A protein has these predicted regions:
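Substrate-binding/catalytic subdomain of NAD(P)-dependent oxidoreductase enzymes
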Residues: 4-68, 73-75, 94
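Short, exposed beta-strand "edge-strand" segments with a Pro/Gly-rich flavor and a Y/T-containing core
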Residues: 5-10, 16-22, 102, 159-172
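Catalytic, metal-anchored helix/loop core of enzyme active sites in primary metabolism
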Residues: 51-143
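A conserved regulatory-domain signal marking ACT and ACT-like small-molecule sensing domains
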Residues: 106-193
């Protein structure tokens, strides 16, 4: 979708990707206590002429249309000039859904031998911006003193502690600013509100 939006090539090697391996039981408990879900999201956010592209675990507000998407379902949410937010979802993971997609591609190739698939974008690279400069509210997990965290990052909306960890939500900031604060944080996840 990022390529379609920009009309230019997005090299996957330039996309910042963080998987789910560092999510903990405490993160899940914090999400539940806040009425949120933890989701692995791929995002492409236009910032002027540049695009911030990244994959990362997110805390997703329960009221968000993406919150109930689970299991083998995949979803995409797009913001259109005339329609606002639109979400499309359906099976996209797991054995049957993947097998169906691969089989559909094979059938298409057999039915249309020699057919060339047109590409609607330029080979010119898209102008990507540093995803660590993307501004949002962030969830923090830490064992540091809450007052020290607030002194460095401003007001934080704290949740009830989980197994000796503090967890809370910052105001609007970016990963660069959080990193520049020099705090030893155990997790920093963006929030989709």
């Amino acid at each position: 979708m990022c390529i379609r939006d920009s009309g230019k090539n997005v090299d996957p090697a330039r996309v910042s990707m963080t998987g789910i391996s560092t999510i903990t039981a405490e993160d899940a408990a914090f999400a539940e206590s806040a009425g949120m879900k933890l989701k692995l999201l791929g995002r492409a956010i236009r910032q002027g002429e540049q695009i911030a592209v990244f994959v990362s675990p997110h805390f997703v507000a329960g009221a968000q249309p993406l919150a109930p998407v689970s299991g083998v379902l995949n979803a995409i949410e797009v913001l259109g000039n005339n329609i606002g937010n639109a979400m499309f979802f359906g099976p996209g993971a797991g054995g049957p859904a993947t097998a169906s997609a691969v089989l559909g591609d094979v059938v298409d190739i057999v039915r249309n031998p020699g057919r060339k698939q047109p590409v609607d974008w330029s080979a010119e690279p898209a102008d990507l911006t540093d995803p660590d400069a993307f501004e949002a509210s962030f969830f923090l997990r830490t064992k540091l003193d809450k007052a020290a965290c607030e002194q460095a990052l401003g007001e934080i909306r704290w949740l009830p502690d989980q197994n000796g960890f503090h967890g809370g939500f910052t105001g609007k900031t970016c990963r660069k600013a959080i990193a520049a604060a020099g705090l030893a944080l155990d997790a920093v996840w963006p929030v989709l509100e």
